[in-house]
């Protein structure tokens, strides 16, 4: 397929405000491509070259990209930088420069073949893999070879892609729906395969080749989508929901981690499927010493502890581990303990279809607890009073509360069901609980906030529609530094119109691709005619909103937008306010 065909589809996707139109455009695009091309097209649309856990990054900033455009067009870098500053879009700067240039190899002169999708993808992969001495010059040379042959519109999307600002916001579930329609594959089966092996590029190629989905199996080294929990506000409700008895375990305030042990070593993946092994060399060493299996997939929580007292510290302390340099110092200053709570695979045995109580037994069989690796503290209860005693014990130890689970539950990858239920101390009265919401729009600041965003439009996610519904407009809780940071992190996702996956009655000054997740707290969940979350679910014509919302200061970079608080959770929180449990 010619790259120009893909670019036409990208432009149409960018222009639409309707998700159904987006799906139709993708279906048409997939049908025109070969199986090999479909996988590469999917990666490109998602703004990636490989799945997230492989950590393949282009390593190209705006200046390097403009150097490549300069080399291809002859335009001065300073001229291109001025154009970029004027437009605010490196892609538009590249498009204008290419349109104004008289390149000897231009297609218009008939001396060059048009760019092919595979050719562009393969070249970009070479750019990402260029490392060491002379890597930047190599990247510039490779990129300029693409720009030299690209049409202005093609150059726009190549430039946006390489600097990570494609701005399409096509979700994984949208891709899955389009693949299902394009190849006549059952959508639920495709979704299940994706939960097991969440590499959409590989999966797209697989279905395009007509291969059966049952060939996709859980594989050590490839992270699965994590199972997620619902929430309730009292022990009696939780036990009733779980059928009368529950495995209750401490809910540690750390970083959720999926640990893969293979003959090649230990890999640690985040809830967003990113490889975070480099941040936790101490955990890697501890797992090798504590786990007897040759191959295993384990789940646990990495918790920061005080080096002097051993007391558990808040999640924020783990941020020191995210620096790529001087990890050894961070390990010494911010030690951790790994609390394991599940096992999904052991030495060729897929345990995801086995009941939790059996998985617990298998976990205890393969783990020899140490001061660095422990099994999460748990008990089985069928009495609400006993659950509450355990809850208070857990909180007094520095945890967030309990996770209560059905003893007979299987591991439902990627699902947020009622087999796992969070019981946190924050749920003890009205909306003392926080919610994780997605930034979908912003409003220009005034006075001290002039030149930045003064408030943000936030939304909850609905997995049944793959859409985001507004919940509140928040401007409180942000320091000057926060406002500057928010402005900077949101710029790559700025788009000229409301995103097709966002449902909003409010008109924001600026719209964004749903990507950035922040934590918010408020006085209560209230009915609102201004917001679309759960519109009509409680009363006709009104939705749910957070009253007096305030930013807590916590950026949830560990969560994807699809892992944000759901509309169902918002409705549940609203209902629970009517059954307030008075704090003791």
UniProtKB/Swiss-Prot annotation:
Keyword entries, A-Z: ATP-binding, Cell cycle, Cell division, DNA damage, DNA recombination, DNA repair, DNA replication, Ligase, Magnesium, Metal-binding, Nucleotide-binding
Residues involved in ATP binding: 249, 256, 271, 301, 341, 416, 422
Cited InterPro entries: ATP-dep_DNA_ligase (IPR050191), DNA_ligae_ATP-dep_bac/arc (IPR022865), DNA_ligase_ATP-dep (IPR000977), DNA_ligase_ATP-dep_C (IPR012309), DNA_ligase_ATP-dep_cent (IPR012310), DNA_ligase_ATP-dep_CS (IPR016059), DNA_ligase_ATP-dep_N (IPR012308), DNA_ligase_N_sf (IPR036599)
Entry's Gene Ontology molecular function annotations: ATP binding; DNA binding; DNA ligase (ATP) activity; metal ion binding
Organism domain of life: Archaea
Catalytic activity: ATP + (deoxyribonucleotide)n-3'-hydroxyl + 5'-phospho-(deoxyribonucleotide)m = (deoxyribonucleotide)n+m + AMP + diphosphate
Catalytic residues (positions): 251 (n6-amp-lysine intermediate)
Cofactor(s) recorded in Swiss-Prot or TrEMBL: Mg(2+)
Keyword ATP-binding: yes
A Pfam cross-reference name: DNA_ligase_A_C
EC number: 6.5.1.1
Family: Belongs to the ATP-dependent DNA ligase family.
Function: DNA ligase that seals nicks in double-stranded DNA during DNA replication, DNA recombination and DNA repair.
Name under which the protein is recorded: DNA ligase
Species per Swiss-Prot/TrEMBL record: Pyrobaculum aerophilum (strain ATCC 51768 / DSM 7523 / JCM 9630 / CIP 104966 / NBRC 100827 / IM2)
